[in-house]
């Protein structure tokens, strides 16, 4: 789905409208197939009550519009209540979590996760004396690893608000829209 979105965006920039239409049709079919295969109507989710299982269908557009508010509410409850402001994602889920929450303006949730100092969190790594990012939240494997660096993008695009303008590819136009969150002072 993500690759089809990229192809569609490239086709759009190049003015290849027929290719955009083909991508739209394939995207609609793929999203519907994934939704049908994985959405549990009884539970109102895509598998289990973990953050990546909420974020991926939201980010990929798999969740129909009617389901999106409830999924986002469940994700928020999972972050704030079940996990007490912590992530329960791995390296891939963390990247997509940061990207989607920034894109929908939920920088408050990202900020909450950033400000945790207990396990599992970046703050926990710092509390344990880390000077680099670890491969695993518990510090078991590599202590100089890039797998949890995905949130650095949030510092630029979310917190500082430096964003590309989709209507003007190649940074021909830049959007500056900083997030006002928590106790951050400028």
Annotate each predicted stretch with a short phrase.
Residues 1-17, 55-66, 96-105, 156-162:
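Well-ordered alpha-helical scaffold segments within catalytic/enzyme domains
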Residues 9-13, 32-39, 80, 102-106, ...:
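Sec-exported extracytoplasmic/periplasmic mature domains
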Residues 12, 19, 42-43, 82, ...:
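Residue-level detector of alpha-helix boundaries and kinks
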